[in-house]
Amino acid sequence: MALNQLSLSLQFARDAEATAHRATLPRHAVARWIRHALAVDAEITVRIVGAEEGQRLNREFRHKDYATNVLTFDYQQEPVAVADLVLCAPVVEREAREQNKTLEEHYAHLLVHGTLHAQGWDHETSEQDAQEMEAYETAILQELGFADPYAA
């Protein structure tokens, strides 16, 4: 299977919570996970942040006053997808622990999830859209050697 081209910028905020995850997110792995979710070529910035920045961005752009796991800012979907994916390290770590997953597994899932959002996928419009997106995420992650992220 030929994968689409990816121009990737990987950033870690100057925050102890974010930089602690640097070893879990080698550039080659992040690029591989994202490329498997791409239907078009892409220019994507991935930024790993701490709780404070995550909460501020979620409040500012989604009007929700808490840090969330991943925020996708999609600027263009065609002919090249252009987006920023912001992942909040302490939220990802807490969720991974609660779901009995490794950090790597959860980051892979959230990066695939965010990449699909960057290409127009949406799980909040209808139950059918949510099911289709979850099924596609699961297929991509299984291709990458990860378990179904939605399995109980």
From Swiss-Prot:
- Where Zn(2+) is bound, by residue? H113, H117, H123
Localisation = Cytoplasm
Cofactor(s) needed for function: Zn(2+)
Q: Please tell me whether the keyword Nucleotide-binding is annotated for this protein.
A: no
Q: Which domain of life is it from?
A: Bacteria
Free-text remark on how the cofactor is bound: Binds 1 zinc ion.
For biological process, the GO terms are:
rRNA processing
Alphabetical list of InterPro entries matching this protein: MetalPrtase_cat_dom_sf_prd, YbeY, YbeY_CS
Q: Name one GO cellular component term.
A: cytoplasm
Q: Keywords on this record?
A: Cytoplasm, Endonuclease, Hydrolase, Metal-binding, Nuclease, Ribosome biogenesis, rRNA processing, Zinc
A Pfam family (short name) is YbeY
Top EC class for this record: hydrolase
Recorded GO molecular functions are: metalloendopeptidase activity; RNA endonuclease activity; zinc ion binding
Record has Disulfide bond as a keyword = no
Predominant location category: cytoplasm
Record-listed E.C. numbers: 3.1.-.-
Protein purpose: Single strand-specific metallo-endoribonuclease involved in late-stage 70S ribosome quality control and in maturation of the 3' terminus of the 16S rRNA.
Q: Which PANTHER family match?
A: ENDORIBONUCLEASE YBEY, CHLOROPLASTIC (PTHR46986:SF1)
Q: Indicate the family of this protein.
A: Belongs to the endoribonuclease YbeY family.
Q: What is this protein called?
A: Endoribonuclease YbeY
Organism, as annotated: Acidovorax sp. (strain JS42)
